[in-house]
């Protein structure tokens, strides 16, 4: 039974990467193009806007699985910085400081630094060529 389940691991790794990539890419899209429902709209050229551009570009690379380890490393650092700069000063506990997404995504991205993109990715296609 376990072997049957383990056979799905590579594909599920790619599915996880795509799902997380869509989330981080959408964060960047919302900050850059100001189309989200929230009230936070960073001014063009401000630090939050630049970080949104970073989320947009690295999020897209992560989403499609191109240079995944590099994009994941950069995004992991970005999420760690976001947590410690924006959330940690409010409280040490993520449920109290609103930093759950940043904390979890930091470690998800760190995992992809070691695992790579998975079989459904540009990286996998380039490695076969």
Give residue spans per PLM region.
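Extended, low-polarity transmembrane helix blocks
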Residues: 1-33, 39, 47-53, 57, ...
């Amino acid at each position: 039974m376990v072997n049957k389940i383990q056979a799905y691991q590579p594909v599920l790794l790619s599915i996880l990467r795509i799902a997380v990539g869509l989330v981080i890419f959408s964060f960047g899209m919302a900050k850059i193009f100001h189309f989200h429902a929230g009230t936070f709209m960073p001014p063009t050229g401000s630090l939050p806007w630049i970080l949104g551009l970073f989320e947009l570009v690295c999020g897209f690379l992560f989403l499609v699985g191109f240079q995944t380890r590099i994009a994941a490393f950069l995004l992991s650092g970005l999420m760690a910085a976001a947590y410690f700069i924006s959330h940690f000063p409010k409280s040490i506990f993520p449920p109290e400081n609103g930093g759950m997404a940043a904390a979890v995504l930091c470690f998800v991205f760190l995992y992809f630094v070691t695992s790579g993109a998975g079989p459904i990715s540009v990286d996998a296609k380039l490695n076969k060529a």
